[in-house]
Amino acid sequence: MSSSSASQPSHDQLATKAQAWSALFSEPMSDLVKRYTSSVFFDKRLWQADIAGSLAHAEMLAAQGIISAQDHADIQKGMAQITQEIASGAFEWKLDLEDVHLNIEARLTQLVGDAGKRLHTGRSRNDQVATDVRLWLRGEIDLIEGLLSELQLSLVEVAEQNVEVILPGFTHLQVAQPVSFAHHLLAYVEMFARDAERMRDVRRRVNVLPLGSAALAGTTYPLDRERVAKTLGMEGVCQNSLDGVSDRDFAIEFTAAASLCMVHVSRLSEELIIWMSQNFGFIKIADRFTTGSSIMPQKKNPDVPELARGKTGRVVGHLMGLITLMKGQPLAYNKDNQEDKEPLFDTVDTLKDTLRIFAEMIGGQMNPATGCKDGGITVNAEAMRAAALKGYATATDLADYLVKKGLPFRDAHETVAHAVKAAVSHSVDLSELPLAVLQGFHPAIEKDVFDALSLQGSLNARNTLGGTAPAQVRTQLARHRARLSA
């Protein structure tokens, strides 16, 4: 058990008590080993999945004639009471019972007697925990997909208001070409859309039933595994019992998808941090997402995006931990796999919290009085435009203009470099150089060059699929609106 577990066991929970498996052993487990090997204080969050799996298993056992109808009814009644106790906080989690499974089974047996002891027929904790984690993760993936949709909608809403706002596009963090601010935001919508696709794809492989694999070799009881899978809404059953109980590739795959999603959040965070700095001043974020300084009264720090950037390393670290956890394990189940839960749980918690916060930080919060969102990012269009002009963002447009006049691109590139040098020496934008000066660099330049050199002209000219022209951006906005509304 991790030393960072939120709840520490009380002294009476450590009282020596027979374990569910202890009949073979000549001495009780030491308190230190109990603490070290117990997982109940973090895996208890699996209780709903554990009860759902047990109820489906019991229903199948009764249908197959392995337990009686009365035992089945008693198990259902006992599980209903346990559900109420856990939900209300009245359930007593005990360290001696090691994990969520044995805690629930022990309470069930206390409530309904022998029927509770019969529930574990045909299964092991090995296939039970693999089932629980899959059921739990399936539900969390569904929540994450919804949160990804909310974040995409927030970005789309801000983009819709800023189609004509011109942002300097950067390469190497140097001004490159002008782009629509909406176009820039939609790049992140594309990333988060792929993240959602990955989550859906992972879900298919998560949503498979290990239960019935038993400890490792299957079971001698006539279980109907497909019936249990159908009851639990799973798409099929694990076809190899050794694989079903031992592999955690589904957890690794989810954490990889979560890591990619957090990397996208981190890239967005970096840009928000840069944009809101005094040196850029492109945006402001609402005060509730910033903090002050204990010594410098003028500071308004972007702690939320900074923390998201930092938490990305945390999630990527969990991915590396899970991969390392699995790499040396022989078949089948090993106790190492107990260490899959804390990184998996923390990855889910971190990702969900981050997506929720970013959706509100970017798009704002619904105001019931107005029916509109308040408090999203505030855009400084003038600062963006000034930065684009200062960086000679239309230099490529001048080169393209000369190519259309018949120059080879490399010659046009060199000609424009000389023009930029002249503009820099006079502290003006290319569009502010007189026509006569521009013609000195090449006689093919005519008055229409100023259409190409304007920021708006540069935007409008990039009217190919996926380009930054406002017409293209509006088409993409409509596509995303339709997709997210479906």
UniProtKB/Swiss-Prot annotation:
Record's keyword annotation contains Transport: no
Protein name as it appears in the record: Argininosuccinate lyase
Source organism of this protein record: Acidovorax ebreus (strain TPSY)
GO biological process entries: arginine biosynthetic process via ornithine; L-arginine biosynthetic process
EC main group: lyase
Family the UniProt entry places it in: Belongs to the lyase 1 family. Argininosuccinate lyase subfamily.
Coiled-coil residues: none
GO cellular component: cytosol
Disulfides per UniProt: none
Keywords: Amino-acid biosynthesis, Arginine biosynthesis, Cytoplasm, Lyase
Catalysed conversion reaction: 2-(N(omega)-L-arginino)succinate = fumarate + L-arginine
Location of the protein in the cell: Cytoplasm
Known pathway: Amino-acid biosynthesis; L-arginine biosynthesis; L-arginine from L-ornithine and carbamoyl phosphate: step 3/3
GO molecular function, a single term: argininosuccinate lyase activity
Gene (UniProt): argH
CDD domains, per the entry: Argininosuccinate_lyase (cd01359)
UniProt EC number: 4.3.2.1
